[in-house]
Amino acid sequence: SKKSIEGVPAVIASLPALMEEPFITSPYNGGKINSIASVLKENGYYSAFFHGGNNGTMGFDNFAFSAGYDNYFGRHEYGPHDYDGHWGVYDHKFYRWFAEKMNGMKQPFFTTLFTISSHHPFKVPDEFKDKFPKGDHPILESIAYADYALHTFFEYAQKQPWYHNTLFVITADHTGPSFTAKYETRKGIYEIPILFFMPGKLQPKEDNSVAQQCDIMPTVLGFLNIKQPFVAFGNNLFNPSSKRFAASFLQDTYQLISDDYLIQFDGTHLLNAYRWRKDDLLLTNVFNGDDTPFLNELNTLKAIIQQFNHRVLNNRLAVTP
């Protein structure tokens, strides 16, 4: 996704951003959807969505409930203190409150946390004004602070009874300002990390194959050995036979990245194709008018678009009895 309001549905409900308008604010947001929370609820899990921002921002509170969360906790529930004057509660304060709230939850539980301090205007608490390097862009200091805040969360969390029985998933909702040409391309503007961590259970490994936010839901549910059917537009990243791709939509153009190619499609015709592993800046369009070399990617993208449009229009974004 390229916006927070698109990233949240992709991460928690495996809903790609394939419309001009974000799903949360679209006419279809009242339809039934499934999510990590809704599926886990059917398996005995309590769920809560924590948002360091002001209640109502981007409709996250309403979306959390429509996605099946039992509770939503925003700045209103946190209280008026520790406000950054713009978005919400400073990360290091909200992290601690988040962890303490989990201490009172009956296991098993599933929580989601959306933090705010690494967002423009990149405010850092006064007490940390000279602690972190400032760099050439204001975001760099705020990223250093956000990293520190995450560190303090894990320092506290590792002492809690739920820590060793928890799968942590860390990712971004979207990219920030770029500093190099690589991250200004139609591939680079989507490049974010996804980290899966479970103390003592997952061995350290770096995987540079294609993944997307929509893969998080099927990966988490697969890891937990959930067998019931659900609707998702991604794949289980822990399954070596899973097909890897990343689909997106921007400025009237659909895009799909596979392990071999990045293709762009206007809904009728293939527009461009790049061998992105060898052409990181996407300088050489290898599409010469013949779709044949790219049929695997093109057919996958068409299938995703068809399924998404059909399910959105017909309220079929969840498995119903």
Pin down the residues of each PLM region.
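Solvent-exposed soluble domains appended to multi-pass membrane proteins
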Residues: 1-321
